[in-house]
Amino acid sequence: MSFSDQNLIWIDLEMTGLDPDVHKIIEIASIVTDSELNILAEGPVLAIHQSEEELAKMDEWCTNTHTGSGLVERVRGSQITEQEAVEQTIAFLEKWVPKGVSPICGNSIGQDRRFLYRHMPELEGYFHYRYIDVSTLKELTRRWNPEVLKGFSKQGTHLALDDIRESIAELKFYRQTIFKI
């Protein structure tokens, strides 16, 4: 175990839609890496129970994707509340990273942070205000050097833990190809 203020916290959420004022979080996962992007630990992967009324707010894409992955079934069978998910996730993070020092890391992580701010403010407050958003590098690469993108592809399962692993792998790819480190 390596508690360090240099460790990075990676988070991914799956939601019932894109509007944090309307939609809910249905899955959360976290991973802690060291500063070299080596995975140190995987946190709890939690399907968060939501009512049928909340699940009915999903659009066709969300319904098809989250049903096809088995997530909707896991959400329906879950007893985990949003607050329990916060508590379990923070209990995991406290073993690896001090509060307030790690940027929030992931792909399109600003969207996840909006949901955390609205639905899990205690967890959102665990992060530094900065972001490490892998999608920023992807968007810049797509515009400035699109050939590089042919060297990396994602499975796109839209399951939180898989998405984090892919985000870490994608950042490692950019580190090697763009930054040559």
Swiss-Prot record:
**Taking every annotated instance into account, which residue ranges of this chain make up the domain Exonuclease?**
8-171
Q: What is this protein called?
A: Oligoribonuclease
Q: Could you name the domain of life of the organism this protein comes from?
A: Bacteria
Q: Which InterPro entries match?
A: Exonuclease_RNaseT/DNA_pol3, Oligoribonuclease, RNaseH-like_sf, RNaseH_sf
Annotated compartments: Cytoplasm
Keywords in alphabetical order:
Cytoplasm, Exonuclease, Hydrolase, Nuclease
- Sorted alphabetically, which Gene3D superfamilies does this protein's record hold? Ribonuclease H-like superfamily/Ribonuclease H
Give the UniProt family note. Answer: Belongs to the oligoribonuclease family.
Q: One GO MF term, please?
A: nucleic acid binding
Q: What is its EC number?
A: 3.1.15.-
Q: SMART domains, per this entry?
A: EXOIII
Q: Say if the entry is tagged with keyword tRNA-binding.
A: no
Q: Name one GO biological process term.
A: DNA metabolic process
Active-site residues from the entry = Y129
The keyword Transferase is annotated on this UniProt entry: no
Q: Name one Pfam family in it.
A: RNase_T
One GO cellular component this record assigns the protein to is: cytoplasm
Tell me the function of this protein: 3'-to-5' exoribonuclease specific for small oligoribonucleotides.
